[in-house]
Amino acid sequence: MTHTTDTIEDKASTIGNAMPHVEVKIIDPETGETVPPDTVGEYCARGYLVMHGYYEMPDATAETIDADGWLHTGDLASMDQRGYLTIEGRLKDMIIRGGENIYPKELEELLFGHPTVGEVAVVGLPDDKWGEVVAAFVRPAAGQSVDRDELFSYLREHLAPHKTPRHWFEVDEYPLTGSGKIQKFVLRDQWVDGQWTEMA
């Protein structure tokens, strides 16, 4: 939660810190170990406000709440030294390329900063060698055209090579949920079915 005394920056960029009598931790999704401050991992919570389980759904409950009562939210987050949390994306959206975890939100925020980009979805696509590789589905900003090489060079100024998208696609419209969120799994499935042509 945030407080009236929190700075504007904290209110705008974090979700605050834990409420009284609630525990939170950030864990490595693969090992379950708590990660150091400012490291991205899965956001878990435990306390009086955590549900006891899904009604008549024991398997779903077991997947979400562990034996120690920790609710595994499926959110990727980081927590600073003060205990303030920042949401970094969804665990299901995380891309694992050759054993390296890549967080789409990081790439998407960088690409949003480019003047030719109106909207973007970064997705992991299956790859025989690496397991997954990074792909960017880009909708140009109004009146703009996007250039693959320009966007690639722009990202390389900020990112390690393995995080830079291998595949680039230009999008007119995204598949959306009823609430307007991009359905990344649909983009992935469409690519597998051969429905996308790469940007030149």
Task: Mark where each language-model region is.
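A structural signal for short hydrophobic beta-strand segments in well-ordered beta-sheet cores
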Residues: 24-26, 75-79, 122
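Conserved ATP-binding/catalytic segment of the ANL
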Residues: 33-38, 42-105, 110-113, 129-130
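Short acidic amphipathic segments
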Residues: 114-120
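Residue-level signal for well-ordered, solvent-exposed loop/turn and beta-edge residues enriched
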Residues: 25, 32-33, 84, 181
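Conserved ATP-binding loop and adjacent catalytic segment of the adenylate-forming AMP-binding
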Residues: 1-23, 36-41, 50-52, 62, ...
